[in-house]
Amino acid sequence: ILGSGDIGLIMARRMALEGCKVEAVLEICPYSNGLTRNIVQCLNDYDIPLYLSHTIVAIEGRDRVTGVRVAKVDERMRPLPDTVFSIPCDTVLLSVGLIPENELSCALGLEIHPKTGGPVVDQHRETSQAGIFAAGNVVHVHDLVDFVSEEAEIAGKYAARCARGEESAARRSLRVWPGDGVNTCVPQRLSLSEGEASVRLFMRAARPMRRATLTVKGAGGDVLLSKRLAVAKPSEMIAVEMDGARFLDSTGDVTVSLEEEARD
């Protein structure tokens, strides 16, 4: 199996339960892109080896797969020729990432974020086109359904308000940018009005970190939030809640960053 995201990990277990011998799960990154519990329950419990910083460089066989050639990769993810070895197998399963399905969003001309692959939304989940709302995996890929449900409630609440003509005029509009250590952050913009309720920010770390500090800053360097995290992983969504009034008082756009504490 090439790829160690949650679907690849779960498929490893499913294949084992169906009677297959899963020879290995290969991951090009130096860390797994799946939840820790899935690594334990889907690989460790079934004695399936996980090769980090490895990828397939060739698939062998003519009419049928007979094996794969695997190599370790360097820090720039380039295969190292002197590390190549073979794994005999008759099936290769590719689990190489999810992309939100956004044919409708593109047809409507919505602004699409280049990293999430979904529409750019504000804290109410309203897209770049007034009156059109989006939530869940169409906005960005989630690892937990709890956050999908939460986003759906937000989008439904404000879509209903919009339909009833109860929207408040935005006093300020600003962008939310991922800074150092952050790969993506949703919402990507904020439409703020007086009495703005709490704002939830959802983000993914750019790399695994232990004892990291999450910082939200205004353009002038004013710190709106500083929170310590025991661990941050690209595979696990980070969610923080902030008082909407804090953004009204900030200067300019907002940047969200993660910094790992120095290790001993």
Positions of PLM-derived features:
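Glycine-rich Rossmann-fold phosphate-binding loop(s) that bind the pyrophosphate
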Residues: G3-G5
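A Rossmann-like FAD-binding core segment of flavoenzymes
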Residues: L9, R13-E103, A197-V231
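FAD-site-proximal beta/loop scaffold in flavoenzymes
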Residues: D90-H142
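Conserved mixed alpha/beta catalytic, RNA-binding, or beta-rich assembly cores of soluble enzyme
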Residues: I112-P114, E151, S168-R171, L214-T215, ...
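A conserved FAD-binding loop/helix module that cradles the flavin
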Residues: A135-D180, A262-D264
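Surface beta-strand/loop "capping" patches
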Residues: E167-P208
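Short, aromatic- and glycine-rich surface loops/edge beta-strands on solvent-exposed regions
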Residues: L201, A212-V216, M242-D264
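Aromatic sugar-binding surface patches on proteins
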Residues: K233-D243
